[in-house]
Every structure is written in structure tokens, then in C-alpha cells.
């Protein structure tokens, strides 16, 4: 068997192009959208799309077809269908993100996998003596916890050090973030050290803020940072992604959050610069050493169907007015509108101005709820789920000495925020249910200290 015949996802072994789009049906009506998401649990205000995303019924049907195709004849699927299907998905994504070459795009399970790929490479450079002990990785303090754990597992234990930049929150401007980031880079270079990697969120998770990613990457280039990894778990489907404009070495975004794919799938962009062979998938298969796109395309027998439905997702989004751009714009505008409604009802604030929001918005909770810890935030979130059928994350804002914070209409310090999401299936009533639940808790003088145990 020729090597090229067995390399799943290898664009060099097939002159494959994404299939032409079939003639689509008309624009989706509100009833059509309800039908697409009829599998969602009824009676729940599901305003947390940011955590786990959603997948329409038509895409789930397409996924089931891929699964059955494998089960009918696994060998034929492995040697033909899988290879071609993965390349079709990668080609769609490559075009969407304006990559120079489809071979800059790999499909992995999630952003956590991509972070492991990057940080394992950095760790190897420390272990092999290419980097000096105490050279640094710079990131924001609110980086996703799995990224921090990967640094601990792969970098810190072999001599690398970490500088965490505190993200201002609530935040009022990009300039506040840029100023803090410059301070972090300066700290990372102290005592003759070299900043080997900067990790930048495109959209932070908790708290949620749209970051000035292009400006931050540009600063990294000006300041001599060796490599830049953008963790954009929430980006594709939320904001325009142009990897050439952004200019990072590595960029990852989940497609199961805001891009309607079933879990789990993310694209991982690795800029071509001659050293791609140093980057490997954490799961080693017989494709090791054949390039990351090929390594990622076969990590052993498993269900690859979520990575094969990207063309079907495009068919779905193109049935909305304006396509993906129209969806992103509406989600942003509705999330901001609902956020302002909640802030007005509770006498609080937004965590960032509308231009620094996406389809997710942070809204301050009334101080009378007395959220005083992460445990209180979890308790309140669980209470809202069980007693009000509202699914929304609660973020505890731990102020440090010297930080003044923001006060609500009762002159109390705002110590917690909810993060609402808006996706095409959401309705105004979902947010009104949250509004009324919080208002009722405050009226009944309920605090996190006297909420009954669940």
C-alpha cells in the first residue's frame, strides 16, 4: 500500500475539493428553528450556549449518516470516506479563516487538545536545552484552567516559568488590556529571561471579554516574543476569524460551541514556517511524523463523525439571512439588548462595553445576594437551575487589595456577574425568567448564605 493511500486527511494524496453546495431551501422560519432544536429540554431557560454549544437536528442527521456509513463497511470508510470527508471539512474551515494552505489546518477534539500540542512542544524545548531555565510563558490570569494545567504538566516541571497578566474587570477599553499586557511582557523579560510563548484569548471565558487580539499579537512581534498561541475557544461563529490578519503562530477554536457542530471538534491552525514537524498530536498513532493534519486525522479507532459534518453545518447556516455573519450580528445585538435589560432591572452594570461583547455578555448581580466566594457562585447557579429552570454561569469577582470595584443602585459592591449567551434558538422569555428569578430572590431577602441546600 502506498503511504499516500493510507494518510487520512492528507491533501497531497488527493486533488479533492469541497463538494459544490447543493441548492438550498429557503430561509429558516422561526418554526423551522424551533424544529431544528426540538431535542432541547423543554421548560428550561437555556442561556449558556457558551459552555457546550448546540447542534441542530439536520446536522445531527448528517452525523448519523456518517456513523452508519462507517458501521456498514468500516474498511471502505477508513480507506476512502474518512480521508475525503476530513479533507472536505478542513477545506471549508481553511477558506473560512483565510488560511494560506489547507495543510495549516488540523482537526482535533477541542481547544484543550490544541493547548496540549503547543505546550508539549514548548516543554520539549526546555527538556532538550533549547530554552533556558526560567524562560517564560506569558498569559492572562483568566486563561482557561485546562491551559494552566497543561503549563503545569508540560512546562513548569521542566524549568519554565509563568507570568500571569491580570485582566482588568469590569473593563472599559482595549487600552486597559493592552497596558496590562505590556507590563506582563516586561515582567517576563526581567533578569535576562526570554518570553518563549504568549497565550492570548480571543474571547475570554469567565469573565467574558472580546480581546484586542490583533493588537496584542502585534505587540508580541514588536517585543520579540518567540511564539504566540491564540486560544479562541469561543471565536468561530462568534466573530470574524482571519488568521492572516491576526498573525499568530497557533490558533484554535472549537466548532461545537458557536459553529453548530456536534461535540467534539475544533480546528487548530499552525502557521507554516518550516518547523511544523516539531508539532505533534498528544495521541501517537502509526501516522506519527507525517505532519499534524495527518496525525490528527487518525488517532485510532473512534467516532470521527463530528469532524465530518462541517459542510452540512455550512448548509444550515446559509439558510439564515446573512449566513454566518448575520447570525453573529444578531447574537451580539440580542445578547447586548438582553444584558442591558437585566442590568437596568437589577440596578447593576455590564462587565464590558457592547463593542467588547460577543454573543455572550457579563451582567453584575445585585449586591444583596451576598456572593462572597466561588462556592457561593456555584451554589447560586445550582439554585437557579433547580428552582427556576435557568441555566446560566455565575462568576465570582474576587477583588484584590486596592481594587475599588463597582457599586450597584443600593450602593453595595458588585461581587458577582452572570454570563448570558444568545444563540438562534433563544427567546426573550429566557432572559425574563432569569430577571424575575434574581428579582424574587432579592425581594425575599435570600442570600447565598441562607439559600436552602439542594
Swiss-Prot record:
Gene3D superfamilies: Type I PLP-dependent aspartate aminotransferase-like (Major domain) (3.40.640.10). The modification N6-(pyridoxal phosphate)lysine is found at residue 257. Residues 14-23 have a biased composition (Basic residues). Residues 1-25 are annotated as: Disordered. It catalyses: L-cysteine + H2O = hydrogen sulfide + pyruvate + NH4(+) + H(+). Induction: By drought. Disulfide bonds: none annotated. One of its GO terms (biological process) is L-cysteine catabolic process to pyruvate. Disruption phenotype: No visible phenotype under normal growth conditions, but mutant plants have enlarged stomatal aperture and increased sensitivity to drought stress. Keywords: Lyase, Pyridoxal phosphate, Stress response. Highly expressed in stems and cauline leaves, and at lower levels in roots, rosette leaves and flowers. The keyword Cell membrane does not apply. Its cofactor is pyridoxal 5'-phosphate. InterPro entries: Aminotrans_V_dom (IPR000192), PyrdxlP-dep_Trfase (IPR015424), PyrdxlP-dep_Trfase_major (IPR015421). Its EC number is 4.4.1.28. One of its GO terms (molecular function) is L-cysteine desulfhydrase activity. It is an enzyme of class 4 (lyase). Catalyzes the production of hydrogen sulfide (H2S) from cysteine. Is mainly responsible for the degradation of cysteine to generate H2S, a regulator of stomatal movement and closure. Belongs to the class-V pyridoxal-phosphate-dependent aminotransferase family. This is L-cysteine desulfhydrase. It comes from Arabidopsis thaliana.
